Design a protein with these regions (language model features):
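Acidic, low-complexity intrinsically disordered segments
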Residues: 2-253
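Radical SAM enzyme core and accessory elements
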Residues: 2-9, 14, 23, 29-30, ...
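A structural motif corresponding to the C-terminal end of an alpha-helix
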Residues: 31-33, 153-154, 251-252, 285-287, ...
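Short helix-capping segments at alpha-helix termini
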Residues: 32-33, 114-121, 279-289, 387-391
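Flexible glycine/acidic-rich beta-alpha junction loops that bind and position SAM and/or redox cofactors
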Residues: 43-48, 131-136, 219, 268-269, ...
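Structural recognition of alpha->loop->beta junctions
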Residues: 141-166, 312-320, 379-400
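Radical SAM [4Fe-4S] cluster-binding motif and immediate context
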Residues: 190-359, 367, 380
């Protein structure tokens, strides 16, 4: 039987086993290929202290352009010990790059000549959203990571978009090197169920697994690149999601499920049906009584998400939802194409308070059109929603650092760059390729990096004053300190 090594590259957190590994294992099982798991994050975790993780974070996210040679050598040694020294055991080396933040480490590791030697008798396959991201700024030419890897013969196959069908073709000896889904016509309902058997759950902080109910998004937010990977929103039948939850519970004993969806209520009707079905299963079978789930969510008007929908979420076991509120300024959210109002936020949080569903709110500081008045709206929003933090309904806010431009997002399209007159200090004609924190706007000249950092620190002060917990606050402040050196 052929054998595959399934690898997840940094940086993903160590809360839950990576969804990509479960997906790949499910496809391997359907195609009679044995496999082993390797979450490279776990290997590095045993070698890095928190401060070293932050150094890597700054490098991967573009806060710093380079990484210390000694630091890179530690990463390379870990790669040699965990991958290269064992590579003779495998027919397929399958690597997942979750996002843009994996570009630099993928380029560093996959160009290792001991790994990609021309006499290799194994196939190197790479996939994940990060493969489609532009590497301009990290290598010569404007091309994607996948294209660069193929051109340099560092890999044998690159998979874009959904990997289930195309990965199966590779396992069946497809000769095609760059595989793309055909207009996303594959039916999510037909894909194999992810398989997490063999994962060492003790390596992770939460006894949980990921589950997928949909791919893509019903919104086209200007700062998000999800459309690049999945241009069409699709969802699975509610019945199949419930059956998968039951299977993982009985196979693995897990009771907590984390949705990978960009938003679990993308299809309101299917989400409502899922909650009803799961609640019915829990009522019938006491084994399932502790089943719970968390996921990303979008605030919707009352006429779309009725009170009965929140009630159904409660009985199905929804414990926490993460929402990209982004700004308490309705004007800024409209610029972002978020498509919900302050009234919708009020309705949503009141329903969550009624049913005990906690919220994590994600925010963006320094959107290109953000004015001082919009900043004051953010401060007023902190005060407005602080009472919900006292009850635990507003579990935490994450302000992040400040807005950065990332290739592949609508903000980096030429008409949007022209609209906001975006340029890089010291280079008036174009923005820094790759990822830019240091951009400036010709139509909003007061919104310098220094001013964005000031506003971010101001929001930290007010959030602390009103006793709203902040996610990763210390980490963000340390990054801001590093960014301030460029301001």
């Amino acid at each position: 039987m052929k054998r595959a090594l399934l690898i997840n590259l940094p940086k993903t957190d160590l809360m839950v086993p990576p969804a990509a590994l479960g997906v790949l294992a499910g496809v391997c099982g359907e195609n009679n290929v044995d496999y082993d798991f390797l979450d490279f994050n776990v290997g590095l975790d045993s070698k890095f202290e928190d401060e070293q993780w932050l150094i890597m974070d700054n490098w991967l996210t573009g806060v710093t352009d380079s990484c210390d040679t000694e630091f890179l050598s530690v990463i390379s040694r870990c790669w040699k010990e965990s991958v290269i020294d064992n590579i003779h055991k495998y027919d397929f080396i399958c690597i997942s790059v979750l996002s843009y933040w994996g570009l630099k480490i993928a380029m560093h590791l996959l160009s290792n000549l001991d790994f990609v030697n021309n006499k290799r008798n194994y196939k190197i396959i790479i996939g994940g959203s990060g493969c489609q991201n532009n590497i301009d700024g990290y290598a010569q030419g404007k091309k994607s990571l996948g294209e660069w890897l193929l051109e340099n013969m560092y890999v044998d196959h690159v998979v874009y978009g959904d990997g289930e069908t195309t990965f199966a073709e590779i396992l069946q000896e497809s000769k095609q090197t760059l595989l793309k889904p055909t207009a996303q016509q594959d039916d999510l309902n037909s894909y194999p169920i992810p398989n997490y058997k063999g994962i060492n759950f003790s390596d992770y902080k939460a006894d949980a697994v990921f589950i997928t109910g949909s791919r893509g998004c019903v919104r086209k937010c200007t700062f998000c690149d999800i459309e690049t990977t999945w241009p069409v929103f699709r969802y699975r039948k509610a019945e199949l999601i419930v059956e998968e939850i039951k299977k993982h519970y009985y196979d693995l004993g897990v009771e907590r499920f984390e949705f990978t969806d960009s938003l679990i209520n993308g299809s309101v009707s299917n989400f409502y049906k899922f909650n009803q079905l799961l609640a019915e299963e829990k009522a019938k079978n006491s084994d399932l009584k502790n089943i719970s789930y968390v996921g990303q969510f979008i605030a919707r008007p009352k006429q779309q998400m009725l009170p009965s929908h929140y009630e159904a979420m409660y009985y199905a076991g929804c414990k926490q939802i993460t929402i990209g509120i982004e700004s308490f300024s309705e004007r800024v959210r409209n610029d972002m194409k978020k498509k919900f109002s302050n009234r919708d936020i009020d309705y949503h949080i009141k329903q969550c308070a009624l049913w005990g569903i906690s919220n994590i709110w994600l925010m963006i500081v320094g959107y290109p059109s953000e004015s001082q008045e919009d900043h004051l709206d953010n401060i007023h929003g902190i005060k407005r929603y602080a009472p919900y933090a006292k009850t635990g309904v507003l579990e935490m806010i994450r302000w992040g650092t400040t807005l950065h431009y990332i290739d592949g997002t609508p903000l980096t399209r030429q008409h949007m760059l022209d609209r906001h007159q975006i340029y890089e200090p010291g280079n008036d004609s174009e923005i820094r390729p790759g990822s830019s924190y240091t951009w400036k706007s010709g139509i909003n000249p007061d919104l310098t990096l220094r001013e964005r950092i000031r506003r971010r620190l101001d929001l930290h002060k007010h959030t602390t004053k009103h006793r709203i917990p902040q996610a990763r606050a210390l980490e963000d402040l340390m990054i801001l300190s590093r960014m301030a050196e460029s301001a």
